[in-house]
Regions:
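Active-site-adjacent loops and short helices of periplasmic peptidoglycan-processing enzymes
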Residues: 23-178, 187-191
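Ubiquitous "structural anchor" signal
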Residues: 15-18, 77-78, 252
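Sec-dependent N-terminal signal peptides of Gram-positive bacterial secreted proteins and lipoproteins
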Residues: 2-25
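A general lysine-centric signal
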Residues: 3-4, 53, 66, 242
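Domain-terminus/edge residues, biased toward the C-terminal soluble/receptor-binding domains
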Residues: 157-158, 171-174, 178-294
Length: 294
C-alpha cells in the first residue's frame, strides 16, 4: 500500500516540478463577469493558470470534497474490487435530516469498495462517502477525516481543512480554488478515477445482504456531461469531474475539458444558490462561468 501511495505521489511531484518556470501566473483577461466567488482555470498541458478569481479565498467545497475522499480510500484499500463493506444503521441514522444527496444504498447492503466509490461520485451519495470513511477509518470517521487533512498537507495545500468526508456544512470545512485544483490534479492520476467521473449513468447489482441481486441505477449530477439532464449546461468537450452545493457553499463545480488539442481543469466555487430572501436560485451559474471560460 505504501508503494502505491509513494508511486502516485512521486509521479505527481515529478510532473509538478517539471512544469516551465513562471507558468503559474494568470495570463488571460476576460470580457465578461463571473458569478462564482472563487475560480481557477488551468491549462493541464503547460500548468499555466489561464484565469483566476480569488483563488486563495476560503470557501466551503460542498460535495467536491468527495474528490479527496476518493483519494484517501484509493490509497488505503489494496483491493477495492474484492473488499466488501456492509452498510450499517449508523450510516443511515447520521444523515437523517441533513438534506443529503443519497445514492440509494440500504442498511444491510453488501457492496464492494469500488461500487461505493461509484455511488459516491456519480450521484454524489453522502451515504456512500460516509460508509467508505467509516470502513477505512476502522469505525472512526474522524480518523478518516484526519487522513484527508494529512493528505491535503502532503500535497502542499495551505488553505484547506476538512471536517467530514461528504461536504455537508461545517464552519471548519473549507478549501480554496487553488488547493482544490491541486487535489483534483492528483486524483486525475489515479487509475479509473476519470472513468468514474465521466460516467453519465450505470446500473449495478447489489452483491449481498437482504437486497442481493437487486439492480439499481446511478445517474450523474454533472449537467456538463449528460445532455438529457439540462441541455443548456451540456458541454461536449467536458470530461467530469464533480459537482457540489448547499446553501452556505453555493453551487460548486470542478470540471475538466479537452478542446482544440488542449486539456483544462476548472474549479468554480460559490455561485449563488439562494437569493437574499432565501429562495432557491435555479440558474446554475457555475456551469455558465465554466463553459464561458473554456
Amino acid at each position: 500500500m505504501k508503494k502505491k501511495i509513494l508511486g502516485l505521489l512521486g509521479v505527481f511531484l515529478a510532473i509538478w516540478v517539471s512544469l516551465p518556470q513562471g507558468v503559474f501566473a494568470a495570463s488571460f483577461q476576460i470580457d465578461f463577469d463571473t458569478a462564482c466567488a472563487a475560480i481557477q482555470l488551468i491549462n493541464l498541458d503547460t500548468g499555466t493558470v489561464v484565469y483566476e478569481k480569488n483563488p486563495d479565498e476560503r470557501r466551503e467545497p460542498a460535495s467536491t470534497t468527495k474528490i479527496m475522499t476518493y483519494i484517501v480510500v484509493y490509497e488505503n484499500v489494496a483491493d477495492p474490487d474484492n473488499t466488501k463493506v456492509t452498510i450499517s444503521e449508523k450510516i443511515r441514522d447520521e444523515l437523517l435530516g441533513t438534506g443529503s444527496s443519497l445514492s440509494g444504498i440500504q442498511v444491510g447492503d453488501v457492496l464492494s469498495v469500488t461500487r461505493l466509490l461509484h455511488c459516491m461520485m456519480i450521484p454524489s451519495g453522502n451515504d456512500a462517502a460516509l460508509a467508505l470513511a467509516d470502513f477505512v477509518g476502522g469505525g472512526d470517521v474522524q480518523k478518516f477525516v484526519d487522513m484527508m487533512n494529512e493528505k491535503a498537507e502532503e500535497l502542499g495545500c495551505t488553505g484547506t481543512h476538512f471536517a467530514n468526508p461528504h461536504g455537508l456544512h461545517d464552519d471548519e470545512h473549507y478549501t480554496t480554488a487553488r488547493d482544490l485544483a491541486i487535489i483534483t490534479q492528483y486524483a486525475m492520476m489515479i487509475p479509473g478515477f476519470m472513468d468514474v467521473c465521466n460516467t453519465r449513468s450505470e446500473y449495478y447489482t447489489v452483491e449481498g445482504g437482504p437486497a442481493a441481486g437487486e439492480q439499481r441505477l446511478l445517474v450523474t449530477t454533472n449537467r456538463m456531461i449528460h445532455p438529457n439532464l439540462d441541455p443548456q449546461y451540456y458541454y461536449q468537450y467536458a470530461q467530469g469531474i464533480k459537482t457540489g452545493s448547499h446553501d452556505q457553499a453555493g453551487y460548486c463545480l470542478v470540471s475538466s475539458a479537452q478542446k482544440n488539442g488542449m486539456s483544462y481543469l476548472c474549479v468554480a466555487l460559490g455561485a449563488p444558490s439562494v437569493d437574499e430572501a432565501g429562495n432557491r436560485i435555479t440558474e446554475h451559474r457555475e456551469y455558465n462561468d465554466t463553459i464561458s471560460l473554456y
